[in-house]
Amino acid sequence: MILPKGKARVGSLLADRTEAGSDGSGMLYGFDYSCGLQATLAICDGFVRAVRLHGSTTGSSIFPARNEPASIPETALVPSNASARVSAMPQNGLRVLVTGASGPIGAALLPSLKASGYQVTRFVRGQPSSEGQIQWDPSQPIAAELVSGFDAAIHLAGETIVGRWTDDKRARVRDSRTLGTRHLAQALAHAKKPPRVFISGSAIGFYGDRGDEILREDSAPGQGFLADVCQEWEAAARPAKDAGIRTANLRTGLVLSADGGALPKMLPPFKFGLGGRLGSGRQWWSWIHVQDLVGAMHHIMKSDLIEGPVNGVAPGPVTNGEFTKTLGSVLSRPTIFPVPEFALALALGRDASKELLLSSQRVEPALLVASGYPFHYSELKKALQAILR
């Protein structure tokens, strides 16, 4: 591929920033064994109710060890002077379409967009209850005129993965993502006035269970139900890309927020000193503070050359054991009650417990770092302190 003038591969830019000493700055659980297995399963169920596919299984430096050079697909390009080449896209009056805005990510995103001067329109499943809402059914095609005239579209909608993974449940999880994304992407592609950028949700579940391997945007997909769904999810956004719309697939990690998601569900047992690691605790968890995830979306909208897969994680992944100890430290509580794998399997089923809680994904936000996104929270302890204190 011939690189346009003024552009450089992310891999090259990342190497430049690393040599300069840049650090890229500038699910969970709770189990109470004292109450027996029934309480354990109940708490586990509470945790899973906090996890959605777009943010489920999912420091100081980008990673504790860097034994391999960063390399990013040629389709993911950023300018060699990234900070100076962020587009001066005027924000006041820009129209943004958002789906899936009722979750903790959307709850943080919407006020942020409005505070920045964007005009926000939401696609909602139920009857519209206020101005700026449009009813839609993700399983049905969307009229192109409904999505015409927007400057950006952010697609976060998808069926929750709560519950055991029966065949019917798997189908709903898959179809809500692939059909909804495909129908939206096709409508955007045929719109008379299509958006300049389409940010479509995905998840680091794309990578599967990878042990200690460092995972970047160009890493191969993994195996398993979630990995398969994520691959189909990203492919479903292709009609927008093929129509010339800049399309980014935001592979979100574990989102930390005080207003929803996994963290509030896991706090009660930890506050009582009953928290502990899951299984061996050696599995890597790649997390991100919700403020940084929202900031990353703003960054993608403004940075004209960011496209393709984008890892929505902080540059400081930790093992589950480290996460457990850090949370206990922030709460000033012990973390001495580990949860065995069999308890997770009893609560969720073997496949769901393995993919949601025990899979290891050590993910690096190579593209966000290389394109100059200034993370507010690169260290887990500071992120948890900001949320909990």
Regions found by a protein language model. Give the residues of each.
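C-terminal amphipathic/interface module of NAD(P)-dependent oxidoreductases
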Residues: P79, S83-P90, L94, E355-R389
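N-terminal Rossmann NAD(P)H-binding glycine-rich loop of SDR-like oxidoreductase domains
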Residues: V96-A115
